[in-house]
Amino acid sequence: MNFFMEKNKDAGHRVTIKIPKTTVNNSLLQEFIKIRKTTKINGFRKGKTPIRVIQEKYGSAIYYDIFKKLMQKFFYEFIKTEKIKIIGSPKFYIHQDEDKKKEYFEYSVIYELYPQFQIKDIKQIKVNKINVEITEEDIKKNIETNKNKKNIWNPVNKAVKSYDRVTINYCIYEKNKKIKKFDKDNISFIVSKNTLIPQLNYKIINHFVNDIIFFKIKFHAFHPEKELQNKDITFKIKIIKIEKKQELESEKSNKKNITEKKTIQTDYQTIKNNLHSQINIITDKYLENQIIQKIVEKNILLLPPLLFQKEIKNLYKQYTKQYQEENSNILEKKYHMSLDSEVKKRLYFQIIIEQIILNNKLFADENNIQKLIKKISSNYKNPMEIIKLYNKNKNLKNTMKNIELERQAMLLLKKSIKIEKQNWNFERFLNYNWASHEELML
């Protein structure tokens, strides 16, 4: 196979490949023979139709299919030989066969390479690891906060304040034209403690029942509602009800009996374990994010536009599916945020981890994978069903394999960099602005 490689400024990488005409003609002949065996044409017995007649009847369509298959076959042989990792779908271009005397057909393929990346100065990277100390008093406070209480919401005739529960109706307009399909009634939420857009929270403060509020927002280009994408939408909000919370001890929690101490002890241990588990997940993720961020700061890592757009589309599909499955509200904050930062974060992590795996020739340890499966399955009512599912499902096996490889790669990174420990108390952990690291929150 003959090929010629070049790099275009705008079109990415390009390779020109030559396919011998004898290869094309032989493939065509084999296809014509297959058709003759299975197709009956008027005037000829089945299997006896002359190749010339088959060629005249089916030639154009078959030639296109055969040449398409050969172009793909030769191109993927080329990337295998050159050990090239491509992104997305390559674009094929057939050259005009002006010189009939040539012994080959010529075509070009434009493709984008997966970024090549070398990690430098890894030992110079410094990050902070947060260690959180939880005291018995912290756990007792947590039990007290989460023990069985009955919340009563009492309607009030006062202005809306933070942490009030508010019920609203709303409708939306584009260029003063109402879009009726998005009308919503009786939407309740707790002010300043919800997952809705910030504009709603601060616009509604200090208003009263029956007040009508207007505000305008521009919907994101990747909002799940295609009809609203990139549009300036005006919301008309009417406040239906304002309520304030009153906490009451339930009858159950007021009963003092012999079993209460056992229950408290059980709650104590469960809450202690849960707190440690959640804190470890959040602080480990925080540490890993620092590592990736520091590596990107010290090393030039350019994300190919094709790879970036591909990941944007994947994330948009995930968001749209989630939006539909959860029957989400158009006011949900996460659907109004740019996908760019999340996509960059994902791709940086993916590229760096893959480079660590490649450089260190890491392989998935089956024993560790089995431990991981057992750990995951223990969270389900029927652990054996999860284990059986893993053994049967190829995609799940690949996912577990990738998780194990990522774990090994991240462990190597942690051993290579400088980690400075920071000791926090539980209160500092709770009051830290984790909102700037929303992906960490469980």
Curated annotation (Swiss-Prot):
The gene is tig. Keywords: Cell cycle, Cell division, Chaperone, Cytoplasm, Isomerase, Rotamase. It comes from Buchnera aphidicola subsp. Acyrthosiphon pisum (strain 5A). It catalyses: [protein]-peptidylproline (omega=180) = [protein]-peptidylproline (omega=0). Its EC number is 5.2.1.8. SUPFAM superfamilies: FKBP-like, Triger factor/SurA peptide-binding domain-like, Trigger factor ribosome-binding domain. Signal peptide: none annotated. It is an enzyme of class 5 (isomerase). Transmembrane segments: none annotated. It comes from the Bacteria. It is found in: Cytoplasm. Gene3D superfamilies: 3.10.50.40, Trigger factor ribosome-binding domain, Trigger factor, C-terminal domain. One of its GO terms (molecular function) is peptidyl-prolyl cis-trans isomerase activity. GO terms for biological process: cell division; protein folding; protein transport. Residues 163-248 form the PPIase FKBP-type domain. Involved in protein export. Acts as a chaperone by maintaining the newly synthesized protein in an open conformation. Functions as a peptidyl-prolyl cis-trans isomerase. Consists of 3 domains; the N-terminus binds the ribosome, the middle domain has PPIase activity, while the C-terminus has intrinsic chaperone activity on its own. InterPro entries: PPIase_dom_sf (IPR046357), Trig_fac (IPR005215), Trigger_fac_C (IPR008880), Trigger_fac_C_sf (IPR037041), Trigger_fac_ribosome-bd_bac (IPR008881), Trigger_fac_ribosome-bd_sf (IPR036611), Trigger_fact/SurA_dom_sf (IPR027304). GO terms for cellular component: cytoplasm. The lineage of its organism: Bacteria, Pseudomonadati, Pseudomonadota, Gammaproteobacteria, Enterobacterales. This is Trigger factor. Belongs to the FKBP-type PPIase family. Tig subfamily.
